[in-house]
C-alpha cells in the first residue's frame, strides 16, 4: 500500500489493527512492544511539544533506539526539517555535519551533545518534510542529500511491491537509521506493510539480537551479513534477507540460500531514497526495476535513473552539484556501470565515479585519498583501486620497497576504518596510464 507520510502509515494501521505491535525493543532488560495505536499517540504528543521549534532544522544523532524513531517521526509531523546523523561517527565529522545542515536544535545522547559543543544556527534552507541524509562517505566531500518523507514512503512502497511483508512478519532493524538503506529497508519497509519492526540494540548485540527478537526478515549490508553467517547467528524463524549498500560475494549469498533462507540483492542510491532494483529470482545479480522507476544505459555504460517519486530534491545548498547530477533531460547520473538484459533486469558491472564503495556501506573519495597518500609518498606516481573488495595501492615505476611504502602510509592507515585500509601494494614498470586530462585510467589498474 502506498503512503504519503509517516503519519499516514501509523494512522492506517492504528485504525486497522490498533493493538498490533509496530515496534519491539529492549527496555530495562525486558522486551517491550509498542502497538501502532500507542506509537501514533506518542508521535502526536511529542510533535505538539516540537511545534515551538518551527522553522528550525532538527539534527538527530540517530542511535536506532525507540526514542530515536519517535523523535524522527514526531519532528517531521511537527513540520520541522530533519537531518539524520550517525551517533557513532567521529566527533569532528558530527560537528562538520551539524554546521553543514544548519541545525537549529539537536537531539541525541546528552553526554554526546555536550561533548560536541553544539551552537544553534538561526536559518535553514530546508523545508518542512525535508529529511537530510549525508552520503556514506568518510571524507569532507560527503554531501547532504535532501529527501522528503514522501519520497522515502514511496521508496518503501517500491520495496514492498516487489518483496511484500505481512502483519505477521517481524523485520529486524540492525542498520544505522542515518543511512538511507537502513532507514527505508530496516524501518519503513516493515511499517508500510503493517509488520512489526524489531529495533536492534547496537553493534555489541549483533551476536545475539537475532536470537533475542526472532525476526522473519532482515535487511543487511554485506559486511554484517558475512559476520552473521560466519558465526552461525541466523535464527530459525528467518525466511527473507535483503542485502544492499555494497558489493556482496556470490559465495555469501549462496551460503544464506543453503540455509533455506530467501535472499534478495538490492541496488539503490541515497539520491533515489534507497532502492531502485531488487533481485527476485535465482540470480541475485539480475535485478527487477522497482515499479516507480525507469532505467537506461548511456553510451559509456553508465546507469541512469528516472525516479520521479523517489529522487532527491538536490544536494543541500549546492545547486552546482545538483545540476551536475542530472542530464539535460532529467535523468540521474549514478556513476555506476551496468546493463539491462532481455527481460529488462539490471546487472551492475562496476563504477564510473572516482569513489570506492565498501561492504560496510561506506565510501572513499579517491582523488582526496590519493592526494593524502601523495603527501606521504612525495614524487610517487600512485593510484588506489578495489580488487575483490580490498583496497589496492598501485605505484608506477616506484623504486621503493613494499616495506618502505607500508611505513610511509602507516599514518594514513591508522585513521581509516578497516574496510578502507590498503590491503595490497602493486607495481607497474612504467608510469600509470592517464587520460588526456591527466586522470588515471582506473579501468586499466
What function would you assign to each model-found segment?
Residues 3-4, 18-21, 118-134, 140-141, ...:
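Conserved pre-ATP/AMP-binding loop-to-beta segment of ANL
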Residues 33-37, 130-156:
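Conserved AMP-binding A3 loop
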Residues 48-88, 174:
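Conserved AMP-binding/adenylate-forming
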Residues 153-170, 177-237:
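Conserved AMP-binding/adenylation subdomain of ANL enzymes
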Residues 198-199, 259-301, 309-313, 323-329:
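Conserved ATP-binding loop and adjacent catalytic segment of the adenylate-forming AMP-binding
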Residues 215-220, 228-283, 380:
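Gly/Ser/Thr-rich phosphate-binding loop
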Residues 304-358, 362-363, 375, 386:
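Conserved ATP-binding/catalytic segment of the ANL
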Residues 384-386, 410-445:
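Conserved C-terminal "lid"/linker of ANL adenylate-forming enzymes
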Amino acid at each position: 500500500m502506498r503512503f504519503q507520510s509517516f503519519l499516514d502509515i501509523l494512522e492506517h494501521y492504528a485504525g486497522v489493527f490498533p493493538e498490533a505491535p509496530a515496534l519491539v525493543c529492549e527496555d530495562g532488560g525486558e522486551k517491550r512492544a509498542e502497538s501502532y495505536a500507542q506509537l501514533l499517540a506518542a508521535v502526536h504528543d511529542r510533535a505538539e511539544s516540537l511545534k515551538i521549534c518551527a522553522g528550525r532544522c532538527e539534527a538527530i544523532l540517530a542511535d536506532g533506539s525507540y526514542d530515536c524513531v519517535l523523535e524522527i517521526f514526531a519532528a517531521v509531523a511537527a513540520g520541522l526539517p530533519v537531518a539524520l546523523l550517525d551517533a557513532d561517527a567521529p566527533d569532528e565529522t558530527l560537528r562538520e555535519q551539524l554546521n553543514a545542515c544548519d541545525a537549529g536544535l539537536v537531539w541525541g545522547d546528552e553526554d554526546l551533545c555536550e561533548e560536541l559543543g553544539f551552537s544553534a544556527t538561526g536559518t535553514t534552507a530546508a523545508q518542512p518534510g525535508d529529511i537530510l541524509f549525508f552520503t556514506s562517505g568518510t571524507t569532507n566531500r560527503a554531501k547532504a542529500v535532501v529527501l522528503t518523507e514522501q519520497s522515502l514512503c514511496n521508496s518503501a512502497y517500491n520495496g514492498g511491491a516487489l518483496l511484500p511483508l505481512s502483519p505477521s512478519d517481524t523485520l529486524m532493524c540492525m542498520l544505522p537509521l542515518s543511512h538511507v538503506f537502513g532507514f527505508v529497508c530496516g524501518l519503513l519497509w516493515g511499517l508500510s506493510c503493517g509488520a512489526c519492526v524489531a529495533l536492534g540494540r547496537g553493534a555489541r548485540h549483533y551476536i545475539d539480537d537475532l536470537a533475542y527478537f526472532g525476526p522473519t526478515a532482515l535487511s543487511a549490508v554485506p559486511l554484517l551479513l558475512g559476520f552473521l553467517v560466519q558465526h552461525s547467528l541466523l535464527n530459525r524463524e528467518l525466511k527473507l534477507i535483503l542485502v544492499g549498500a555494497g558489493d556482496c560475494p556470490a559465495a555469501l549469498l549462496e551460503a544464506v540460500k543453503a540455509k533455506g533462507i530467501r535472499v534478495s540483492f538490492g541496488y539503490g542510491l541515497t539520491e533515489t531514497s534507497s532502492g531502485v532494483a531488487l533481485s527476485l529470482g535465482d540470480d541475485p545479480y539480475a535485478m527487477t526495476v522497482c515499479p516507480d522507476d525507469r532505467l537506461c544505459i548511456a553510451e559509456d555504460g553508465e546507469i541512469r535513473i528516472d525516479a520521479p517519486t523517489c529522487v532527491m530534491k538536490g544536494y543541500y545548498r549546492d545547486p552546482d552539484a545538483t545540476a551536475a547530477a542530472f542530464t539535460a533531460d532529467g535523468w540521474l547520473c549514478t556513476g555506476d556501470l551496468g546493463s539491462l538484459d532481455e527481460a529488462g533486469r539490471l546487472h551492475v558491472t562496476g563504477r564510473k565515479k572516482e569513489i570506492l564503495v565498501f561492504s560496510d556501506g561506506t565510501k572513499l573519495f579517491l582523488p582526496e585519498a590519493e592526494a593524502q597518500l601523495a603527501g606521504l609518498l612525495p614524487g610517487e606516481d600512485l593510484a588506489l583501486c578495489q580488487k575483490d573488495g580490498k583496497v589496492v595501492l598501485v605505484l608506477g615505476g616506484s623504486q621503493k620497497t613494499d616495506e618502505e611504502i607500508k611505513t610511509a602510509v602507516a599514518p594514513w592507515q591508522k585513521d581509516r576504518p578497516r574496510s578502507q585500509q590498503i590491503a595490497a601494494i602493486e607495481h607497474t614498470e612504467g608510469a600509470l596510464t592517464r587520460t588526456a586530462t591527466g586522470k588515471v585510467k582506473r579501468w586499466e589498474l
